Amino acid sequence: MANLLKTVVTGCSCPLLSNLGSCKGLRVKKDFLRTFYTHQELWCKAPVKPGIPYKQLTVGVPKEIFQNEKRVALSPAGVQNLVKQGFNVVVESGAGEASKFSDDHYRVAGAQIQGAKEVLASDLVVKVRAPMVNPTLGVHEADLLKTSGTLISFIYPAQNPELLNKLSQRKTTVLAMDQVPRVTIAQGYDALSSMANIAGYKAVVLAANHFGRFFTGQITAAGKVPPAKILIVGGGVAGLASAGAAKSMGAIVRGFDTRAAALEQFKSLGAEPLEVDLKESGEGQGGYAKEMSKEFIEAEMKLFAQQCKEVDILISTALIPGKKAPVLFNKEMIESMKEGSVVVDLAAEAGGNFETTKPGELYIHKGITHIGYTDLPSRMATQASTLYSNNITKLLKAISPDKDNFYFDVKDDFDFGTMGHVIRGTVVMKDGKVIFPAPTPKNIPQGAPVKQKTVAELEAEKAATITPFRKTMSTASAYTAGLTGILGLGIAAPNLAFSQMVTTFGLAGIVGYHTVWGVTPALHSPLMSVTNAISGLTAVGGLALMGGHLYPSTTSQGLAALAAFISSVNIAGGFLVTQRMLDMFKRPTDPPEYNYLYLLPAGTFVGGYLAALYSGYNIEQIMYLGSGLCCVGALAGLSTQGTARLGNALGMIGVAGGLAATLGVLKPGPELLAQMSGAMALGGTIGLTIAKRIQISDLPQLVAAFHSLVGLAAVLTCIAEYIIEYPHFATDAAANLTKIVAYLGTYIGGVTFSGSLIAYGKLQGLLKSAPLLLPGRHLLNAGLLAASVGGIIPFMVDPSFTTGITCLGSVSALSAVMGVTLTAAIGGADMPVVITVLNSYSGWALCAEGFLLNNNLLTIVGALIGSSGAILSYIMCVAMNRSLANVILGGYGTTSTAGGKPMEISGTHTEINLDNAIDMIREANSIIITPGYGLCAAKAQYPIADLVKMLTEQGKKVRFGIHPVAGRMPGQLNVLLAEAGVPYDIVLEMDEINHDFPDTDLVLVIGANDTVNSAAQEDPNSIIAGMPVLEVWKSKQVIVMKRSLGVGYAAVDNPIFYKPNTAMLLGDAKKTCDALQAKVRESYQK
């Protein structure tokens, strides 16, 4: 029994029981029970993690001893990453000298410098070349490895069975960098591709060095120089790198490959893809082309023979895994080339693609320079070592993602393209046992993968299905419906005044439509602010209905006074905020301004009217026309930076003239005038105070709050007008029209009022920005709409005052509730559309007042504002590829979303620190910054502006790319950057800058996610499919500054985080921007 108990307890994973086997039976029971009752938490202890803690492991970086090998396995930056992960790192003295990395660099990075024997005895050894005999020590490097240690290096196991035998004797675990599977998830640690990229670039540089002419064509005074013609055979990594380098140097580049996808890549780089007449796919496994048929090879040879007579430089990269390189160019072809031509054989190490190649040598054969070097990556040792180091550090992090322990599991059962595939393919020996080659993975794609159609291609196919007849019929039907509606309005018109008002409304809408389209996107925020101020003309309605003496004497007069007071807040506050924003766009180099001179036309307009009124002239309609034209001019003035301040001045003149004309029509007595003046003065003072104190970053919520005032003023005016006009309904032929307009204006005003308050609460942080998705909200909204529409029936049928005022009160409440339910269901990121829609609503509410009071000015201005908001809403929706109904009803997905399973994102991301980011910024000549709402939230515009100023002074080309919906209202980011002093001429819109990304060295993405998400173009099943985005991933390097890798508002993973040219700089945007600014300043001062 004791032996049985000993067996049980020693086999138990709980440390509590591991030492009980030697105890006597009774004592065992007593201690067991006591321990159980006093240390119960140990029974719930988590299982011990597998592997060895990083801090107990040492990574060794020996010096490469292969002849002419200048690379080193780890750069100082790589050492720093491993030390940060927890490893101890030792580097052989002088290991990085040939790569321009001194021992001091490694010490600063956290490594210790030791001798060759000590380094090779490390737990984990990383090398470039496979272990070989060390001539200095007189011993094979494999014999110096630690027993049961780990080696990471290029191994080529199929060609080196003797080396595997030596490593097996040391019970070594070997990861062969040359065996990393060429699958998407492994791109970051594909060392063969990294080295091939360098070889391809170096091949062009060497060819240019030995070629006797310019690559680019030139016309000089001495004569014309034709461009060099280059043929590149093989569209793999090396071939494409060669094509890119040669094209950038101005040569005419031609590319050949047996794979259609590779030819497409040649074409995308600007090279001319060459094909043979015979159609045969060359798609093979592992990223290589397959061997072709005899007929295809004969056609290929014919093409090559023809090209040899035309081109100046030949670069060939064709390899077949595990076999001798195919001879593609025989001696006769080479000798047919022009004297002075150059051939570069990147397959020389495997025998070469040219019959005349001498591996490892440079020589001239009958005037043709042959470059057959087999160590091209080593000839760019610094760059090659850096990339190889990145490959190794990423591989280690990927195979052992645990934060504390180093551990990876090698399994023979794995799926294609997974991390298990990468580990099993890379590990060629486990604890001394050779496990190469890896077994075949499961779920291998059969043949060439079918290329998924892009969103643009699907949209083009969809457009092609619409026949010209159907398209024309759709247009004709729309015009037919519109003209029929106009005829219906004419028939239903109760009098001539209504027809004239409809005419005014229609013409004003057309003028507003064309005027607003001319406004530059950078000025959309000032546009909304000035329309907010102009919408304060609801004060006209309030003034027209005010009465009494020093105080209102009836309910309707009180409502009117309140409407005038509220509207005055909008007028004064709106114009002041607009002026503040426009002042921020001023540049130090701009000429002086004399805006006070606009007092001259203002004084002439208002003073002239007062003089005419005193002389007995009734020119109020002309005043309304002039005021309306000034309001049109206000919107038109905002089309450019140069006329924006004139636009704001015209808006003030228009509103002042309209108010003056209204007072002239009313001719109030002294006491009533005092009441009007007091209400407007108080409201204006409050508006000026708010506008003066508001921070520009809080502009969206201010606009939303001002919208609510317009909506409330419209409701009050409509109800007051009903109360005042009710006694005349029995004798007024237009009574029904007045009632309909009053009801409609009350409904629109109620929705605008409550919806704006909810938008304000979300933007101000008083309410959660996340959408409030009430159960059955669509049915609820439909019920509220039906009740609101149904309320007009008793309102129109029953002539009693009680029924009428009850219906107006009910629709006010119903519309207010509907405004809450609609806006609450919309998330914070959709606020740009919400604000523009509310802006449009306020315009239509103003139009309703114009019809109600038969006032041309209100109708004109309302149509301008309504069309302005509608156009901005349309622009925002187009920028998200969503319908307005989708946004307003709290929906998700774009109009292009296919609805299938979204694309799976694979791969690993690359994280960098501030020093790495500074190095990338320092090396870049052209930089684009793409800010998002994260910049607004963090208020990081000031350090970014200072950073841009310093970089510009260093001669770098720095610009901003702004997405239309990057912020919480249109143009918000433009205003924030202007506030920080960024010149507006370097702040470009998405459509203006998207075509520049491919030529940009570096993009800084600050606090943006969905607006730079490549899934919008790459994944037809994404919910943001078809959404126009900033194409930052097309640039050479991208740094994404975010708090985490989390999703954006659309809850869609962003593939750019995992692209090979993207680096993640994680952290708080404000702190990161401050740190970047400080680091650049420090570097700048040096």
From Swiss-Prot:
GO terms for cellular component: membrane; mitochondrial inner membrane; mitochondrion; respiratory chain complex. Widely expressed with expression most readily detectable in adrenal, heart, kidney, thyroid and adipose tissues. Homodimer. The modification N6-acetyllysine is found at K70, K397. The chain crosses the membrane at residues 475-493, 501-521, 527-546, 558-578, 596-616, 622-642, 646-666, 672-691, 702-722, 740-760, 778-797, 801-819, 833-853, 857-879. The modification N6-succinyllysine is found at K117, K224, K294, K331, K1079. Coiled coil: none annotated. It is an enzyme of class 7 (translocase). The transhydrogenation between NADH and NADP is coupled to respiration and ATP hydrolysis and functions as a proton pump across the membrane. May play a role in reactive oxygen species (ROS) detoxification in the adrenal gland. This is NAD(P) transhydrogenase, mitochondrial. One of its GO terms (molecular function) is NAD(P)+ transhydrogenase (Si-specific) activity. In the N-terminal section; belongs to the AlaDH/PNT family. In the C-terminal section; belongs to the PNT beta subunit family. It catalyses: NAD(+) + NADPH + H(+)(in) = NADH + NADP(+) + H(+)(out).
